[in-house]
Amino acid sequence: MDSQRNLLVIALLFVSFMIWQAWEQDKNPQPQTQQTTQTTTTAAGSAADQGVPASGQGKMITVKTDVLDLTINTRGGDVEQALLPAYPKELGSNEPFQLLETTPQFIYQAQSGLTGRDGPDNPANGPRPLYNVEKDAFVLADGQNELQVPMTYTDAAGNTFTKTFVFKRGDYAVNVNYSVQNTGEKPLEVSTFGQLKQSVNLPPHRDTGSSNFALHTFRGAAYSTPDEKYEKYKFDTIADNENLNVSSKGGWVAMLQQYFATAWIPRNDGTNNFYTANLGNGIVAIGYKAQPVLVQPGQTSAMTSTLWVGPEIQDKMAAVAPHLDLTVDYGWLWFISQPLFKLLKWIHSFVGNWGFSIIIITFIVRGIMYPLTKAQYTSMAKMRMLQPKIQAMRERLGDDKQRQSQEMMALYKAEKVNPLGGCFPLIIQMPIFLALYYMLMGSIELRHAPFALWIHDLSAQDPYYILPILMGVTMFFIQKMSPTTVTDPMQQKIMTFMPVIFTVFFLWFPSGLVLYYIVSNLVTIIQQQLIYRGLEKRGLHSREKKKS
């Protein structure tokens, strides 16, 4: 099997994978808003079962730090809007990326509070608490490392509930602390809760284009427990009322999208119930409810939880909660993508340019795989040397396919040739290629990362299609330089058009991925010449016998 035939095999595998990915995406379509018109649900694990209230109207206060710009509703203390000043909405835009939003077109909120028998957020106790706040705007001043936003509510019995948001400079993790002061004569039973709710359907202004030519990043819910480190939960599963209902000591719940995430991390010193809920009107939720805490008369009890609202920065997320960094969507090849990203990030710490880092990592990967590449070309050379014997065998045995197969395998064994030896190294490269794709599409560090000249975003396609064309040219040169024994006219035509077909495929791929493939092809050309020189000395290759 020669290199051009191997190329055809890889192309077929590649196209088959694309079709499979597209089918996976299409067979689980997102539910349409009009299909979920109910306003409540009583499914197991629903928000109603957990005693989690609906949103209400209150005064909006703003909180600004160096990395967050939040809007909090004093009715319940929910975060209804979150802007990320460090991340523009689009490349070259001065408008910050909006993660949380509350508009008629789209809802994405981070709710929290105190429910349970005596909790002010328990629907059975009336409307959600209307907190008192000292001022309408809070700003983390220059030189200030921490900002506290206290909100206080006193119920009819005189019990005081204080909810304090604690922000730190440069941090996307927000501590939400609760203080319950019991001024009555009976114990108070309260439970902290945290809930994320979001509209299933994306309006046009929220579509980030995370689906790219059949490969797409995950948008949905997720959770983590000590037993299940990371589990995705699709929005359409929640909309179908197939709800989550598990108890866990520790862990977290989250909502994910390309590059960004929100997550509630409760305290791990008690048992928490994780749930999902279909809230109706095309809105779904995931949340937690902590085990009840008894506050004795005359006593004050403190509780806390943490909200992550921001980019999926892996090292910072890992420091907030175990396995929270797994929310970075590297797909089913995460075990390859994660080491690749760590290596890429290490290289970037020296180089300072993600594009040059990709070039260097390409040389490293291809260098590591050089022994396999050499074995591949050696195997193909031996196969070419056997072609006269194989052809004579076919003529001698005629239509006896069984005898042909038996004698061919005996010939391979005698000559110590593996007929699949030329294919295996190329098949190994395909997972690396796809893992790099997921890494480019899932790592926030590569979002809007420039390279050079006209490439201003390595995670987006080349706007002028120059890189895909260069990739096609390098592929054409590899094809022309590779010996072939293909005689079938149809296969020859397919081989001729293969660079064109791949160029068309790569038009929509991230430019960082195309850059990797171009450099990989250039390395292939260099390695090819070195290997052929060695094979010539062994009598396994002749440039004169090369067919174009």
UniProtKB/Swiss-Prot annotation:
Statement: the UniProt record of this protein carries the keyword Transport: yes
Subunit structure: Interacts with the Sec translocase complex via SecD. Specifically interacts with transmembrane segments of nascent integral membrane proteins during membrane integration.
Segments crossing the lipid bilayer: 6-26, 350-370, 424-444, 458-478, 499-519
Organism: Salmonella paratyphi C (strain RKS4594)
Role description: Required for the insertion and/or proper folding and/or complex formation of integral membrane proteins into the membrane. Involved in integration of membrane proteins that insert both dependently and independently of the Sec translocase complex, as well as at least some lipoproteins. Aids folding of multispanning membrane proteins.
Biased composition (Low complexity): 29-42
This protein's name: Membrane protein insertase YidC
A biological-process GO annotation: protein transport
Membrane topology: Multi-pass membrane protein
Keywords noted in UniProt: Cell inner membrane, Cell membrane, Chaperone, Membrane, Protein transport, Transmembrane, Transmembrane helix, Transport
Gene3D superfamilies: 2.70.98.90
Recorded GO CC terms: plasma membrane
Major localization listed first in the record, in broad terms: membrane
Keyword Isomerase: no
